[in-house]
A protein has these predicted regions:
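Bacterial signal peptide processing site
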Residues: 21-23
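Bacterial N-terminal signal peptides that target proteins for export
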Residues: 1-7
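Hydrophobic core residues within well-ordered beta-strands of beta-rich domains
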Residues: 39, 64-66, 120
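The feature marks short-to-medium sequence segments in extracytoplasmic or secretory-pathway proteins
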Residues: 71-120, 145-150, 161-165
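Short, surface-exposed ligand- or partner-binding patches at beta-edge/loop junctions that are enriched
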Residues: 123-150
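C-terminal motif of bacterial Sec signal peptides marking the signal peptidase cleavage site
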Residues: 15-19
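Short, solvent-exposed beta-strand/turn "edge" segments of beta-rich domains on protein surfaces
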Residues: 47-65, 76-77, 112-115
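Low-complexity, acidic Ser/Thr/Pro/Gly-rich terminal tails and inter-domain linkers that flank the onset
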Residues: 28-60
Length: 166
């Protein structure tokens, strides 16, 4: 529930605030290479399932598994974590979710560094309502203000349209 609430806040921010790079918001499809400030990523494939290892979704939900390839293009290691990507659907206040916690297998860790020149593949697993058939995987650039860990400037927002098979 906490992750879903945070996703709602991110969704509200994404829908109301323009990025610092102008009004640019770039939309992509599964298989397209998305180039951000720090790295490139591709959503290679999306599947749905009723269970991921030992994790079962709430009643009425299922899991969307987004397989990604990330490639660092930045001159330094880029810290990554579970909150970097969010899956959003519909237009309501509760229509979004952060990935579930790391369960193992090919899932991307909750925290890791994307080292200069590194290519990493893995998946993010999201809990979504059963009836959702289309969504967007969202990444938004956030730049630290000086030494602050809590003050950010928003950069560009990237969305990848995904179909969630029944």
């Amino acid at each position: 529930m906490k992750k879903r609430f945070l996703a709602v806040l991110l969704l509200a921010a994404l829908l109301t605030l323009p990025g610092c790079g102008g009004e640019k918001q770039t939309a992509f499809q599964v298989g397209d290479k998305v180039e951000t400030y720090w790295f490139q990523f591709t959503v290679d494939q999306v599947k749905t399932t009723d269970r991921w290892m030992d994790y079962q979704p709430q009643e009425g939900d299922r899991l969307a598994v987004c397989y990604l390839t990330l490639e660092s293009t930045f001159s330094e290691a880029v810290p990554m974590n579970w909150a970097d990507f969010v899956l959003v659907w519909g237009g309501g206040e509760a229509d979004g979710s952060y990935p579930i916690e790391y369960q193992g297998q090919e899932q991307l860790p909750d925290e890791y560094d994307l080292v200069k020149g590194e290519e990493r593949t893995g998946c993010l697993v999201f809990e979504v309502p059963q009836g959702v058939t289309q969504a967007k995987l969202v990444f938004q650039e956030l730049f630290n203000e000086g030494d602050s860990d809590s003050v950010y400037t928003e950069g560009d927002t990237y969305t990848v349209d995904v179909d969630l098979p029944a």
